[in-house]
Amino acid sequence: MSNMFVADVGGTNIRLAQIENGQIKAIKKYLCTEFDTIAEAITQFGDDVGQDSFEHGCIAIACPVNHDLVKMTNHTWQFSKKALRDELSLSQLHVINDFSAVAHSLPTLSADQVIKIGRGEADPKGNIVVFGPGTGLGVEHLTLTAAGWQTLDGEGGHVDFAPNDEIDIVIWRYLKEKLGRVSAEEVLSGRGIVNIYSALAVNAGEPEDYNDPADITERALAGTDTLCVAAVTQFCRIMGSFAGNLALNLCTTGGVFIGGGIASRLGEFFVNSEFRQQFEAKGNFAGYVENIPTYLINEPDHGLLGALAYLLQQTKETN
């Protein structure tokens, strides 16, 4: 089928892919600000790839998609799903959350599209979880049903932060006084890196020289600031503990995947961190989680791949 498109829409860019025989044929990226509406962007894409019209489409977008009216939180675009489908003369239009698309990409990823961290082998039919520290902390589960892979939506990034060591307690106390309640997102996100750094600085009686996560991670990777190194080191440890909790929540024997931009930017620092050690530090259940693999997603097009996987599953169900 060559009359299909998928889109991955963020606050800055929209990336679109033309589909032929169930595979991505061509990819184009545009600035969202180039177009007044998303319909204009999709129409321009069709012109650029020589496709007069599409029959099926799937849009993965970074905002809530529960209702017919979709309003982006980090851009001016808004649209009615039904009206957009009619405007583009589509038989089917599916609109899913961008993190749901990431989840749907996971069963399609090959070994060279991920970086495996630690031991464990995936059960191909086992439950899967993906989480992604970024601007916030997204969490999504996948489970295999007779109809195919189904996402289990939730707000896992907003569970309570559970301290595991003395440094965690220092961070928790600092944020508890500052925020009242400390969620996982307050330590596992861009601002989470800043929060950890600030807590360690205050505890050590040192000045808080940096308030940008990029500045802190840059100095941690370069090894030029001991407090920045300590903050990012603890960030990786906390991420491991959180990932282990997710694995236990739904027995994710199919693997735990890490998306979002932060972990991938940390690169070797993250791979060589104590992430996996903390992931397996589950007391009586250490033997269980040590058999669950953990992966860092290393595929820049995973949003498009996930939207495609979802679209193919939906068109198969209706045929």
Task: Set out the residue ranges of the language-model regions.
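Glycine-rich phosphate-binding loop of actin/hexokinase-like ATP-binding domains
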Residues: 116-183, 268, 274-280, 286
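Active-site nucleophile and cofactor-binding loops and adjacent substrate-binding regions
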Residues: 72-75, 94-101, 120-123, 130-133, ...
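Glycine-rich beta-strand-to-loop/alpha-helix junction loops that act as flexible
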Residues: 10, 57-63, 98, 133-135, ...
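A general structural motif
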Residues: 1, 52-56, 90, 125, ...
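ATP-binding/phosphotransfer module of carbohydrate and carboxylate kinases, centering on a glycine-rich
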Residues: 1-51, 169-319
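ATP-dependent carbohydrate kinase catalytic cores
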Residues: 92-123, 214-226, 233, 241
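Short beta-strand-loop/turn "lid" adjacent to the catalytic site in phosphate-handling enzymes
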Residues: 49-95, 100-113, 265-268
